[in-house]
A protein has these predicted regions:
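The feature captures the beta-strand-to-loop junction immediately N-terminal to the Walker
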Residues: 38-40
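Conserved ABC ATPase "signature" region
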Residues: 101, 105-108, 113-129
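Conserved structural motif at the start of ABC-family nucleotide-binding domains
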Residues: 7, 22-24, 78
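Hydrophobic anchor residue at the start of the ABC signature
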Residues: 147
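Catalytic Walker B motif of ABC-type/P-loop ATPase nucleotide-binding domains
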Residues: 158-162
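Conserved ABC transporter NBD signature motif
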Residues: 61-72, 76-77
């Protein structure tokens, strides 16, 4: 592992039964860098994320986040990593604000309403929708709520699985700009 790496795959191999899902994967991601895994269905993108989150174990090699081996120290990752899965479970009978409050309390994260509102503005979710039930939200609005929730974790590492799913082209551009802004902020703090 390189000493300046925040995320490191070192000869990472993951096998399930007799199938090799990842084979000798190697990469390093430094602080403030944006890194994307691209590939078709079955290429191993979600398997890679699950391995770095400690949800799947490496068969050989290692997956480390902030120096913690994801296979042997998964509990060490919980406060260091925020994860936005491809399909986020939010409660349709609760409003966007109520969902965020609930999931932050479950995670033990204490945030003020001002912090929450700032995150919702940052992801460009219209204010008139914040207190409406999620059952009235479009898929894109639900995704923006989930992104705001992930941002509120203030974790040094943010894993995103298909984060722009359900967003229109303008919202995708806004999201990409937001990710660049977040990465630049982390890079500036590391100097």
């Amino acid at each position: 592992m390189q000493t300046n790496s925040v995320i490191c795959a070192d000869a990472l191999t993951v096998c399930v039964d007799d199938r090799t899902l990842l084979d000798n994967l190697n990469f390093n991601v430094g602080k403030g860098e944006v890194f994307a895994l691209l590939g078709g269905n079955g290429a191993g993108k979600s398997t890679t994320l699950k391995t770095f989150l400690g949800l799947m174990k490496a068969s050989s090699g290692s997956a480390t986040v902030l120096g913690h081996n994801a296979s042997t120290q998964p509990n060490q990752l919980q406060k260091s990593v925020a994860y936005l899965p491809e399909s986020v479970t939010l409660y349709g009978h609760l409003s966007g604000v109520e969902n965020i409050r609930y999931f932050l309390s479950v995670a033990g994260v204490d945030k003020s309403d001002d912090d929450m509102f700032a995150a919702l503005r940052k992801v460009a979710l219209q204010e008139d929708s914040w207190n409406k039930a999620l059952s009235n939200y479009s898929k894109g609005m639900r995704q923006k709520t989930a992104i705001a929730l992930a941002l509120l974790r203030n974790a040094p590492v943010l894993f995103l699985d298909e984060p722009t799913s359900g967003l229109d082209p303008a919202a995708i551009d806004e999201f990409n700009a937001l990710v660049s802004e977040l990465a630049a902020g982390h890079a500036a703090r590391s100097r």
